[in-house]
């Protein structure tokens, strides 16, 4: 078989990490290719007179007064801790918020929004002081996340807008007093990590029954913070939650406390445990093993049971708070024996029924609890996309749909259309553009959440809901046809991952696929195509991506391929694992909205910026060697230290699936660390390197154990200075010689000016070796799966 024949057996999959449909038909599938049929109705906002908007609701909190339905609290607070909404396109200040729902309104409606423009935060934790003040108001404590603050608001339940001081947006900031919790830090702040804030990042909150002690889950501090004498001296005590392995990061998230305040429970995202702390002694008294990635915590009314949502395990752990033992683990999957993927996050209780928000299956599991450890799932309720928070008030279930039920082309508009936007561009929203201050909004801000109010179903209604959920998730109805009914004839897959391009930007003007089937695209958006959308301003025709189009027409045009990602972090996880975990979905939004943290989503955990940073001294000094930098980076790869990557899904990655199937695989650029000769020299000089970096790769190592020995050590990971294939100069040189010299930068280029490292050059050299061996009659060493990352599509 000659090289041309080998190439003809390849299946080249060209994807972007934010592919979405061009259609706005509400009957068509939304992200992930599944229809959404949310039960109930959307909660309205009385200010805007349209559906209330929230950026990734993560919790609901009921007010402690007795002025509401049934003599319970009048208000329900939705805690919106995602990237944040964007009021207009003039800036990128993602505004998190607290939405105040008046349960006395008919129907319940949002009557106040308190906005926290970045870097301000409402980060997961919101609690009321249970003790009312003389005027009937309550203190309201709110985690400030990145800024290491605990905000203190006053809540007046008799008022129509109960929270003071307010921040109604769009150009307001929170002016409430706060408690500085930087004192919980065990490490100094650095401009190279967490945007120069001390690594504390308060998240979940709980408060003692007397209202005088606050408990804080410090997500980057790996600790429980205790603030005693809350009204006066405010003494801070830190309880380290790490195990003996101090290089194991546990990421505390939620906290719950018993009324007697003799025990506090902390869910730790990366420890598979709920840690029990005795506050009086500031000491850990138990570690209760639960499922992978424990997230939400909920105590029953008697505080005898603690329910724990295990997001990466598709389960809920039940802990006996007397013995601090897990007495039951309830599966909330659709059936046993299937891989995890529901991602339970939010919890709510009503009597003996536990409601569990399954974020990735767009459903709420209804669990009938049993004291004898025989709890069972009664059925499922359909929701919007990514249900991430739940509350029950009377006979109404409130569902925070983290990614909404359909959005238009502004982060301030949500609806029930089932539509997702086709990426930001100048026309969005249609007919307005930038002149109206709405066009061109950021993609992560566009995908926002909303709140559904659902009447609790009786048994027949729950049965109908369950069938709908099963249909939505492809478990009922016609079976989808397999690409190949029998054994696949495909021997090799070369999976090319690019990003920051929508389908329509590249293929929107392709009229038909290779077999003649009409393609579904919008040619006006095809700015990287070959039609009118790609024409120069003077009207001159351009054909910008002929190779992409040739591959798509030969091997497959995925015009109906849906991916539930909005940016690089979740995009690379969807691309390589077909999943994005709770950690990725939450933490990347905080990071991308300029609320600190670091890029934790491709195998590193808490890696500081080791590269030259303007205004900061070098981490290493002028005599640093390559291995010094490499060893520093290895300190932040969890598997090298007996730990787990907090971002890692239980089903792992495509290459792990290949290994389980007995297939060979090789990786080019994904989940790797690389250093070039120019990188090391730039670190020595503490000066940013210049484009293009075609210098040799001098160090390369995997961030996943299953990639050890399975990657090309010359191929670079993400780096905007290393060319994917060519530079402008090498391209023009090739044109000037009518193609007699290659446009690709490679190590054996005939022109010394273009000799060096490019991603395509490295891959092509290795591929030619595989092809030559096969042509010479040797065994076929081309891997069954090749994963190839091309990162230079960023604009």
Mark where each language-model region is.
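Alpha-helix initiation/capping motif
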Residues: 2, 228, 278, 320, ...
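A short, polar/charged loop/turn motif at coil->beta-strand junctions and beta-hairpin connectors
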Residues: 9, 43-47, 173, 552, ...
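N-terminal pro-sequences and low-complexity stem/linker regions of secreted or lumenal proteins
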Residues: 447, 462-795
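Bacterial N-terminal signal peptides that target proteins for export
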Residues: 1-10
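A periodicity- and composition-biased signal for non-globular, repetitive helical segments
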Residues: 10-11, 21, 507
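Positively charged, low-complexity intrinsically disordered regions
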Residues: 5-6, 236, 351, 717
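Small/flexible residues
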Residues: 6, 51, 64, 151, ...
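Predominantly soluble domains enriched in secretory-pathway, periplasmic, or organellar proteins
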Residues: 14-481, 486-487
């Amino acid at each position: 078989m000659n090289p041309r024949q080998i190439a003809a057996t390849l299946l080249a999959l060209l994807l972007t990490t934010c592919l979405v449909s061009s259609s706005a038909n509400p009957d068509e599938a939304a992200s992930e290719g599944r229809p959404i049929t949310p039960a109930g109705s959307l909660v309205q906002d009385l200010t805007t007179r349209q559906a209330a908007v929230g950026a990734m609701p993560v919790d609901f909190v009921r007010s402690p007064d007795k002025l509401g339905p049934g003599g319970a609290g009048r208000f329900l607070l939705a805690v919106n801790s995602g990237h944040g909404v964007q009021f207009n396109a003039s800036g990128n200040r993602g505004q998190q918020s607290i939405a105040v729902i008046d349960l006395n309104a008919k129907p319940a409606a949002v009557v106040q929004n308190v906005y926290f423009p970045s870097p301000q935060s409402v980060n997961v934790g919101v609690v009321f002081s249970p003790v009312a003040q003389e005027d009937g108001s309550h203190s309201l404590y709110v985690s400030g996340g990145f800024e290491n603050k605990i905000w203190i608001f006053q809540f007046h339940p008799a008022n129509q807008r109960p929270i003071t001081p307010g921040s109604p947006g769009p150009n307001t900031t929170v002016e409430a007093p706060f408690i500085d919790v930087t004192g919980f830090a065990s490490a100094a702040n650095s401009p190279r990590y967490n945007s120069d804030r001390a690594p504390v990042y308060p998240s979940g909150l709980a408060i003692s029954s007397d209202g005088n002690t606050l408990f804080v889950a410090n997500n980057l501090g790996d600790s429980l913070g205790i603030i005693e004498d809350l009204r006066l001296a405010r003494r801070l005590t830190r309880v380290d939650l790490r195990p003996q392995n101090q290089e194991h990061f546990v990421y505390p998230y939620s906290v719950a406390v018993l009324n007697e305040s003799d025990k506090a429970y902390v869910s730790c995202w990366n420890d598979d445990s709920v840690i029990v702390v005795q506050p009086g002694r500031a000491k850990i008294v138990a570690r209760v093993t639960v499922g992978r990635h424990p997230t939400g915590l909920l105590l029953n009314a008697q505080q005898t049971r603690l329910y724990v949502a295990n997001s990466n395990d598709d389960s809920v752990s039940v802990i006996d708070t007397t013995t601090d033992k897990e007495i039951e683990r309830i599966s909330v999957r659709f059936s046993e024996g299937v891989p995890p993927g529901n991602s339970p996050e939010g919890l709510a209780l009503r009597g003996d029924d536990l409601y569990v928000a399954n974020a990735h299956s767009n459903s709420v599991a209804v669990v009938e609890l049993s004291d004898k450890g025989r709890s069972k799932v009664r059925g499922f309720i359909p929701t919007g996309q990514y249900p991430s928070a739940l509350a029950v008030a009377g006979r109404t279930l409130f569902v925070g749909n983290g990614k909404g039920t359909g959005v238009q082309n502004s982060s301030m508009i949500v609806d029930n259309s089932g539509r997702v936007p086709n990426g930001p561009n100048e026309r969005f929203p249609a007919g307005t553009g930038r002149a109206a201050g709405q066009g061109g909004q950021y993609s992560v801000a566009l995908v926002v959440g909303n709140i559904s109010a659902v009447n609790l179903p009786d048994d027949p209604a729950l049965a109908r809901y369950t069938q709908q959920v099963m249909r939505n998730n492809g478990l009922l109805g016609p079976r989808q046809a397999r690409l190949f009914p029998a054994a696949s004839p495909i021997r090799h897959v070369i999976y090319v991952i690019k990003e920051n391009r929508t389908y329509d930007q590249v293929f929107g003007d392709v009229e038909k696929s290779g077999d003649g089937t009409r393609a579904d695209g919008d040619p006006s958006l095809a700015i990287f195509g070959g039609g009118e959308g790609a024409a120069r301003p003077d009207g001159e025709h351009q054909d910008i991506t002929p190779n992409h189009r040739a591959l798509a027409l030969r091997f497959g045009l995925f015009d109906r391929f849906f991916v539930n990602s909005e940016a690089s972090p979740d995009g690379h996880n969807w691309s390589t694992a077909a999943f994005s975990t709770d950690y990725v979905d939450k933490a990347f939004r905080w990071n991308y909205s300029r609320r600190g943290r670091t890029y934790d989503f491709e195998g590193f955990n808490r890696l500081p910026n080791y590269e030259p940073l303007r205004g900061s001294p070098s981490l290493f000094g002028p005599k640093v060697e390559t291995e010094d930098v490499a060893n520093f980076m290895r300190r932040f790869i969890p598997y090298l230290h007996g730990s787990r990557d907090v971002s890692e899904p239980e089903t792992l990655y495509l290459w792990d699936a290949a290994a389980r199937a007995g297939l060979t695989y090789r990786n080019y650029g994904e989940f790797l660390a690389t250093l070039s000769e120019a990188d090391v020299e730039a670190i020595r000089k503490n000066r940013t390197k210049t484009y293009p970096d075609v210098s040799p790769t001098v160090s390369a190592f995997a961030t996943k154990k299953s990639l050890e020995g399975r990657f090309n050590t010359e191929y670079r990971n993400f780096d905007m200075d290393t060319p994917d294939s060519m530079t402008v100069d090498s391209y023009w040189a090739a044109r000037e010689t009518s193609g007699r010299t290659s446009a690709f930068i490679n190590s054996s280029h005939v022109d010394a000016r273009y000799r060096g490292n490019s991603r395509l050059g490295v891959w092509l050299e290795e591929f030619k070796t595989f092809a030559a061996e096969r042509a010479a009659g040797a065994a076929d060493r081309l891997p069954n799966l090749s994963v190839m990352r091309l990162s230079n599509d960023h604009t």
